[in-house]
Regions:
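Short, well-structured beta-strand/strand-turn elements
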Residues: 74-81, 340-342
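Conserved C-terminal alpha-helix-loop-beta "cap" of PLP-dependent enzymes
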Residues: 298-417
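Conserved PLP-enzyme active-site core in the AAT-like
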Residues: 2-18, 23, 33-39, 43-46, ...
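Short glycine-rich or small-residue beta-strand-to-loop segments that form or flank ligand, phosphate
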Residues: 50-51, 77-80, 315-320
Length: 418
C-alpha cells in the first residue's frame, strides 16, 4: 500500500536525529570491541575447535578475556554449552547461593522463566532454588526506578545476592540504563560488602556507551543468541564480573576445582568472535527498527514504550495493541516477512514457562534468537506486542510494512486511507 510507505517515510523523517545518535553509539562500542581484539592479537588459530577436556583451549580462553575487557571486569565465563539466558542466570544463582541464603530482587518479580528457577509460585519445578532452601524476596520499582531505600530494608543478615533485571520482560515499565544501578551498587558495597549485585543484562548489551559493570554491578549475565552474539553466535551464554565469583559460577558449570580450565567445543569459535565483533552494528540496526515501530504506531494513536523520542536502554519495543486480534495479526505479519519459515502462521499456544498463551513470530536463522527480528506477546490485556531485533534496518522496515498490511487485511486495524 502506498499509504503505508508514506507513513514510514514520515516516521523516518521524524527519527533522523535519533538515528544519528544510534550511529554515534555504534562507533564508540565498535572501537571498544576492536581494541579488545587487537590487544589479544586475535588470529585464525583462535577459531580452531577443541575436544575432550579442553585444557589450554586458546580460543575459549582468549574469547573470555575479550568479554572481560569489553565489560571492564576482572574475568568472564563465555560458553557455548550454556543453553539460554535463563540457563546463564540459573548457573549464576546456583553458583553463588547456599541453603539458607536469601536472594532479593530489586526490580520486582523477574521474567517468567526465571521464576521457575527461583521457585516463586506454589507449583515450583523440581530442582528450584526454593527446593534447595534458598529464600527469595521481591522489591517493586518505584516510579519505574530502583527503590534503593526499600532494597536496603529488604537486605537481611542472610542475604547473599541482590538481582536486578535491566529489561522490561513482559511488564509495562521502563527498562533500566547502566547508570540506574549505580546508587544501588554504592549502597550494597558500602553497607553490605558481603552481598553481590547481579544484573540480568539480556537485551541491553551495546545499547548504551557502557554497561552495568561500569557502574558498580558485580556481575552481568546474558545470552549469546541475543545482543552480544551479533546474530552469528549459534548458542551460548556469558557471565562477566569479579574473578572470585566467576570461579564459583564456573565450578557450578563444570566442577569445583576445575572451573574455567576445562570445556571443549568441537566446532569453530569463529562465530563467537565474529558475532561479538558485529554486535555493536547489529544492535544499532535493531534499535533503529524498534524506533521505527514506536514512531509508526504512535502516529496511529497506540501507546508504546519506550516512546519514540527518548533514549533507549534495550532493544525491546512494547506496543499496546489493545485487542488480541491486533496482537496476533501483528505477529503474523512479522512472521510473513521473515527469511525463515515465512509460510508459517503463528497462533497463540501454551508455551512452557509462561502463565498465559503466547503468540510468537520468530523466523530466525538461529532458533529463538532475539537479536534477529522477532515479535511476541502474552494473550492477556492490554495485549502488548514485544518486538525486538533486526539483522538489518531495511529488513525491519519491510517487516513493519508487512505487519501493518496484515493488521489492515484482517480488520484488526483501520486502514489509514479510510
Amino acid at each position: 500500500m502506498k499509504q503505508i510507505e508514506q507513513m514510514i517515510l514520515q516516521a523516518e523523517q521524524e527519527l533522523k536525529d535519533a538515528f544519528a545518535r544510534i550511529d554515534e553509539n555504534e562507533t564508540v562500542r565498535t572501537r571498544q570491541v576492536l581494541d579488545a581484539f587487537r590487544r589479544e592479537g586475535v588470529s585464525y588459530r583462535h577459531f580452531a575447535p577443541s575436544t575432550g577436556y579442553g585444557y589450554d583451549d586458546i580460543g575459549r580462553d582468549t574469547l573470555e578475556r575479550i568479554y572481560a575487557s569489553v565489560f571492564h571486569t576482572e574475568a568472564a565465563l563465555m560458553r557455548p554449552h550454556v543453553a539460554s539466558g535463563t540457563a546463564a542466570l540459573s548457573l549464576t544463582l546456583f553458583g553463588l547461593t547456599r541453603p539458607g541464603d536469601r536472594i532479593v530482587s530489586a526490580t520486582g518479580m523477574p521474567y517468567d522463566t526465571l521464576q521457575g528457577v527461583i521457585g516463586t509460585g506454589e507449583d515450583t519445578p523440581p530442582g528450584s532454588l526454593k527446593e534447595m532452601g534458598v529464600l527469595f524476596e521481591c522489591v517493586e520499582l518505584k516510579d519505574g526506578k530502583i527503590d534503593v531505600p526499600a532494597v536496603e530494608k529488604a537486605i537481611k543478615a542472610d542475604t547473599r545476592l541482590v538481582i536486578a533485571q535491566r529489561s522490561r520482560g513482559y511488564a509495562w515499565r521502563p527498562s533500566l540504563f547502566p547508570e540506574d544501578f549505580e546508587e544501588l551498587a554504592d549502597m550494597i558495597h558500602t553497607k553490605h560488602p558481603g552481598v553481590t549485585l547481579m544484573v540480568d543484562n539480556c537485551y541491553g548489551e551495546f545499547v548504551c556507551e557502557d554497561e552495568p559493570t561500569d557502574h558498580g554491578a558485580d556481575l552481568c549475565v546474558g545470552s549469546l543468541i541475543n545482543n552480544p552474539g551479533g546474530a552469528i553466535a549459534p548458542t551460548g551464554g556469558y557471565v562477566a564480573g569479579k574473578r572470585e565469583q566467576i570461579e564459583r559460577i564456573a565450578g557450578r558449570l563444570t566442577a569445583p576445582g576445575l572451573g574455567r580450565e576445562i570445556g571443549s567445543y568441537d566446532a569453530s569459535y569463529r562465530p563467537f568472535y565474529q558475532g561479538l565483533f558485529m554486535a555493536p552494528h547489529t544492535v544499532a540496526q535493531a534499535l533503529k527498527t524498534a524506533l521505527l515501530a514506536s514512531q509508526l504506531f504512535e502516529n496511529l494513536g497506540l501507546e508504546t514504550t519506550p516512546p519514540s523520542g527518548v533514549r533507549r536502554a534495550d532493544i525491546i519495543q512494547a506496543i499496546k495493541m489493545q485487542t488480541p486480534e491486533r496482537l496476533v495479526a501483528f505477529c503474523q505479519g512479522i512472521q510473513t516477512a521473515s527469511p525463515v519459515d515465512s509460510m508459517a502462521m503463528p497462533e497463540p499456544w501454551d508455551m512452557p514457562g509462561y502463565d498465559d498463551p503466547v503468540v510468537m513470530a520468530a523466523g530466525t536463522f538461529v532458533a529463538g534468537a532475539s537479536i534477529e527480528l522477532s515479535a511476541d506477546g502474552p494473550i492477556r490485556p492490554p495485549y502488548t506486542a514485544y518486538m525486538q531485533g533486526g539483522l538489518t534496518y531495511i529488513h525491519g522496515r519491510i517487516a513493519l510494512a508487512e505487519a501493518l498490511k496484515r493488521m489492515i487485511e484482517t480488520g484488526a486495524l483501520t486502514s489509514p486511507e479510510s
